Structure formats: C-alpha cells, structure tokens
Curated annotation (Swiss-Prot):
It is an enzyme of class 1 (oxidoreductase). It is found in: Cytoplasm, Sarcoplasm. InterPro entries: Globin (IPR000971), Globin-like_sf (IPR009050), Myoglobin (IPR002335). Heme b binds at residue 94. The keyword RNA-binding does not apply. GO terms for biological process: removal of superoxide radicals. PANTHER family: MYOGLOBIN (PTHR47132:SF1). Nitrite binds at residue 65. Its EC number is 1.7.-.-, 1.11.1.-. O2 binds at residue 65. Monomeric heme protein which primary function is to store oxygen and facilitate its diffusion within muscle tissues. Reversibly binds oxygen through a pentacoordinated heme iron and enables its timely and efficient release as needed during periods of heightened demand. Depending on the oxidative conditions of tissues and cells, and in addition to its ability to bind oxygen, it also has a nitrite reductase activity whereby it regulates the production of bioactive nitric oxide. Keywords: Cytoplasm, Heme, Iron, Metal-binding, Muscle protein, Oxidoreductase, Oxygen transport, Phosphoprotein, Transport. This is Myoglobin.
Length: 154
C-alpha cells in the first residue's frame, strides 16, 4: 500500500494542526478510545482506575501518555511510509511487553479520525480523512508484520 504525494500532503497538513496541541489531542483521542472500547483501558495499569470522562480529563498521566502516543505517531507519519526504524522498537514493546492486539490499533485509529474531524472539521474533509485512514492502515499493516516476526499473533 502506497500513499500518493497528494495524500501525504493531506496527512501532514492535518498533523501540523495536531502538533499545535499534541497533549490535548492525545488526551482527547485516548478518552475517545476508552469510552468507545472500555476493554482497552485494561491494558493500562496507570489508567484502569479512571472510570468517568471527568476523571480522564483531570488525569495528567493520561495527558502525558496521549502526548507520547501522538509524538511517536507523528514521527512515523512524517517518514511517509519509510518508517522501519521507528516501527521496530514500537512493535517490540507493544507485542512483547504490553501485548497490544492489532484490533486495539484499529480502535485507536478510529478514535484519531473521530477526534481530528471533531476538532478540525473545516480542515479534515473526506479527502483528508481518506488519506489519514490510508496512512493509519499502512502503519497497522506494517506493525502487524513486525508482530508476526516477533511471534505475537495480536
């Protein structure tokens, strides 16, 4: 799967808006993930105790983790598909230490699309959404291949 230059332009254009408030976007994305798929919360010892959206919004740890997640994803997106070096340690930790199923990466991808659309409706139309979906699908496909190399069937 390959994105065109025009698709990468759309992806990186919206990502520039994310970078204006990485922690805030990350927090919103994690809250969206946890609300939509509460089972994902069980993978996070630091956040298991957070039961309400208000508790999640008040959590500095959640905000910090959202920043970490989106900083890593931004680094991957900026490589425009040439993300082998960035992907390897991420796949290693998510497969062997955290045991995060690929399905959960689909869930967070959906949360990313949802939050970007709700925060930036004028800048995240159908073309940009399709491009971001394609970029996130490429990421998931490549991380799934790494999982397989590591013997994790997540």
């Amino acid at each position: 799967m390959v994105l065109t230059d025009a698709e990468w332009h759309l992806v990186l254009n919206i990502w520039a808006k994310v970078e204006a408030d990485v922690a805030g976007h990350g927090q919103d994305i994690l809250i969206s993930l946890f609300k939509g798929h509460p089972e994902t919360l069980e993978k996070f010892d630091k956040f298991k105790h957070l039961k309400t959206e208000a508790e999640m919004k008040a959590s500095e740890d959640l905000k910090k983790h959202g920043n970490t997640v989106l900083t890593a994803l931004g680094g991957i997106l900026k490589k425009k598909g040439h993300h082998e070096a960035e992907l390897k340690p991420l796949a290693q930790s998510h497969a062997t230490k955290h045991k995060i199923p690929i399905k959960y990466l689909e869930f967070i991808s959906d949360a990313i699309i949802h939050v970007l659309h709700s925060r930036h409706p004028a800048d995240f139309g159908a073309d940009a959404q399709a491009a971001m979906n394609k970029a996130l699908e490429l990421f998931r496909k490549d991380i799934a291949a790494k999982y397989k190399e590591l013997g994790f069937q997540g």
